[in-house]
């Protein structure tokens, strides 16, 4: 059925689907067909119509079930975020306020946590950050706010630590290493009473950390990951042999430098 529908829909068409008359499983197939047409044909689903006769009132109201696709959009966005950490996928679902979330995602993924936090805080302070006329947005509100909660951390070292932890969990090892290094530098600057946002003072904090074997190892591992630099350290060479070794090495280094909590069984 999905193949037949796709054969009769041109790219960019608007499609209305009527599931009023058919087998009971037809609405479920229609929903899959709608999702398939949006991806395979870039089609717009104008409506999914369902009419049901009510013998008590002798009327047959017709309902538009297209709102189910909105829920599917949110589920897909959550899945995408959990896979790669890019909450910019929520931006199109949030109306005008979504632009701030998209900006925050861009800055975070280009490792500018200060700008990312600024945009996230701006989004979180808006009353219209979720569309009031979108029940699906309300349904997923708590999940989204939970996923971007790092910006509520009290200081830069804390929020960079959260980002390092999250990217490690998502298997983005380059960003995990970068944010781990930045968190260590921020923590050192704070401990020294330096201005954590001043580049010169951050460089001084970095120099102070070079005496730490863990910091040097993490920095070398980051260089190997980001630039393809051949490691001279045998420990790093072992870490790069497979993903399990790499994940464990990063977890160990981040725990050593930042006190990253270990999950039970890890």
Task: Give the residues covered by each predicted segment.
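Long, low-complexity, Lys/Arg-enriched
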Residues: 1-14, 29-266
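Gly/Ser/Thr-rich loops at beta-strand to alpha-helix junctions
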Residues: 19-32
């Amino acid at each position: 059925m999905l193949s037949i529908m796709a054969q009769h829909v041109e790219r960019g068409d608007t499609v209305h689907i009527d599931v009023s008359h058919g087998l009971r499983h037809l609405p479920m197939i229609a929903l899959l067909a709608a999702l398939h047409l949006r991806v395979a044909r870039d089609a717009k689903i104008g409506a999914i119509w369902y009419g049901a006769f009510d013998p008590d009132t002798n009327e047959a109201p017709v309902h538009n079930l297209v709102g189910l696709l909105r829920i599917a959009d949110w589920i897909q966005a959550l899945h995408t975020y959990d896979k790669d950490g890019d909450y910019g996928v929520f931006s199109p679902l949030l109306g005008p306020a979504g632009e701030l979330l998209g900006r925050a995602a861009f800055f975070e993924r280009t490792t500018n946590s200060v700008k990312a936090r600024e945009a996230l805080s701006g989004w979180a302070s808006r009353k219209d950050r979720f569309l009031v006329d979108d029940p699906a947005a309300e349904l997923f509100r708590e999940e989204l706010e939970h996923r971007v909660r790092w910006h509520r951390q009290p200081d830069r070292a804390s929020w960079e630590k959260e980002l390092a932890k999250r990217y490690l969990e998502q298997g983005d090892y380059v960003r995990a290493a970068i944010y781990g290094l930045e968190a260590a530098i921020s923590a050192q600057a704070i401990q020294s009473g330096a201005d954590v946002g001043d580049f010169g003072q951050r460089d001084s904090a970095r120099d102070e950390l070079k005496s730490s074997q863990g910091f040097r190892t993490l920095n070398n591992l980051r260089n190997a990951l980001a630039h393809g630099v051949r490691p001279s350290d045998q420990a790093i060479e072992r870490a790069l042999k497979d993903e399990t070794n790499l994940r464990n090495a990063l977890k160990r280094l981040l725990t050593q430098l930042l006190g990253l909590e270990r999950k039970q069984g890890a």
